[in-house]
C-alpha cells in the first residue's frame, strides 16, 4: 500500500483521521469531564503534526498523480470533518 502516492495518502489519511477522532472523542471529554487538560495538549500537538504531514502527502500525491483539483480539495476538506478521511478513502480506493 505504501508503494504508490495514493497508497501513501490513504495510509496517512487513516492515521490523521484516527488522531482527529481520538482528539474529539477521548481527549476532549477527558479535558471537560475529567478535568485533564493535558490530554488535549498532548493529543492536539500530535494531531497537529500529523495534519501537517497529511497535507504534505496530499500535495505529493496531487503532483505525482496529476489528478484534478477536485480530488485535492476534497482531501483537504475531508481532513476537517470527523470521519471525513474515511469517506475520502472510499473514493481513493477506486481511483485509477
Swiss-Prot record:
Coiled coil: none annotated. GO terms for cellular component: plasma membrane. It is a multi-pass membrane protein. Keywords: Cell membrane, Membrane, Transmembrane, Transmembrane helix. The keyword Cell membrane applies. Its main location: membrane. It holds the Pfam family DUF3817. The chain crosses the membrane at residues 14-34, 38-58, 67-87. PANTHER family: MEMBRANE PROTEIN, MEMBRANE PROTEIN-RELATED. This is Uncharacterized membrane protein YdzA. The gene is ydzA.
